[in-house]
Each structure stands twice: as C-alpha cells, then as structure tokens.
C-alpha cells in the first residue's frame, strides 16, 4: 500500500525542509511548484523525471540528451489515460543543452554541450504550450520536484529511486520503501518500445498450507518490518 494522506503531507514538508537547507530561494521555488500542482486546471496523474529518461541507454560514445525518449514515455502514459507532467531543469529547455552522458567529451573550460535539432526544440515548445512541461529553475535540485509530484498522487516515472533523499524527507526507511513501491515506476526503452514496471507490493510471495493437525498456516511478509508473520488457524472438528 502507498502512503496515507497524512504521510504524504509529511513528505511534502520534508521536501520543503530539504530545499531550505540549500537556500531560501530553493524552498521558495519548490513552493511555487507546489502551487502549480495544486492550482493547475489539470489534475496530473503522472510525472516524468525528464533527465533520467532522456539519458537512458546513453552511456556510450556518442550518447546524448534525447528528448524523443521522453516523448516515447509520455505517449505510452497518455495512451493509458494519464495526464502527464514532464519536469526538466531549465538548462535542458533551451536550444543548446549540456551533455552529461557518461562518455561526453567536455569542451575546454566548460561542460560538453549539444544543440537540439528542430524536432526536439518543437517538442519542448509543444509541451510548454500544453502546460505539461515544468522548467526547474537553475541551481535547484530537480529530484525534489518529481518527488513532490507524487505527494499529489502522481505516478512518477524514473529509474532514480531517490535513495539519497529518504533520510531527510521520509520518516523511516520503511516509509520510504512503501512510497517507492507504490509511487515510482521504472522504465526500459528498447527497439521494441517502452516498458513501464512497478516493483511488487511484497518482495516475497505469501505461503499457505494445511498441517496434519488440521490447522491452516498462513505466512506473509510484514511490509514495514521486513519480517515474516505466521498465523495458525485451528478448525474445530465436529464431534
């Protein structure tokens, strides 16, 4: 099961606190995004971690930031009836963007860069016009934005499980695990298309058997504790 409304509100406050540790500006910008989610005429149901998806499978010589990979994921989500929001750092919403793929060759005294082609620029502009692209201000931590989206019951699409954030945002590791299982879908992109998958609710299957004494024994994992719970049910025989 996912987090309760009260727990989601607590996570939201944890995100604001995390942003404020960087600067008051970061907190103010995240609060603006919170207002955007709350007041937008659409009720978004999915949020895509843009950079994570765009760089998927790009750690090779010639790899680059690929907005069309984001589009492929957006198309799948919209086909399933989702109202989709894409979060991207502002530096990726311009005609020339950084290239942070693993094998990008930095230019002298600056980051490697790439120029988006006309199709990619038009794609970003189309999302902007539809109100489904949010440019995260420079120097702000973009992970906090898509995580915040999940507190409004959005399904997040990212292969980044935000493990670096749970200690400052979630009350416990168990709460973080429940959030991750319920709110974050991983993504794979191949020539065959896009595959979205969420981890199962339980990491282990339940087990049940009937003992020789006529008792039903059910064993199931306790989600928060990572332990196993055994229940013995004894059926009274008719005399």
What name fits each language-model region?
Residues 1-239:
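Noncatalytic, typically N-terminal accessory segments of nucleic acid-processing enzymes
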């Amino acid at each position: 099961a996912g987090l309760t409304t009260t727990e989601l509100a607590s996570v939201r406050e944890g995100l604001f606190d995390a942003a404020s540790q960087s600067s008051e500006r970061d907190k103010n910008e995240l609060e603006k995004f919170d207002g955007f989610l709350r007041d937008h005429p659409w009720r978004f149901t999915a949020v895509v971690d843009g950079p994570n998806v765009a760089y998927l499978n790009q750690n090779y010589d010639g790899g680059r930031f690929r907005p069309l990979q984001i589009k492929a994921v957006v198309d799948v989500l919209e086909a399933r009836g989702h109202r989709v929001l894409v979060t991207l750092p502002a530096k990726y919403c311009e005609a020339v963007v950084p290239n942070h793929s693993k094998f990008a060759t930095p230019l002298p005294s600056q980051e490697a860069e790439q120029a988006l082609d006309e199709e990619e620029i038009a794609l970003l502009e189309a999302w902007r016009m539809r109100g489904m692209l949010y440019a995260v201000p420079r120097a702000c931590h973009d992970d906090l934005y898509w995580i915040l989206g999940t507190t409004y019951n959005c399904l997040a699409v990212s292969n980044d499980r935000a493990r670096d954030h749970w200690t400052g945002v979630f009350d416990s590791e168990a709460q973080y695990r429940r959030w991750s299982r319920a709110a974050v879908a991983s993504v794979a992109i191949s020539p065959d298309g896009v595959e979205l998958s969420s981890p199962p609710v339980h990491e282990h299957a339940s087990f049940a058997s009937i003992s020789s004494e006529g008792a039903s024994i059910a064993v199931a994992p306790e989600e928060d504790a990572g332990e196993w719970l055994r229940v013995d049910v004894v059926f009274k025989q008719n005399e």
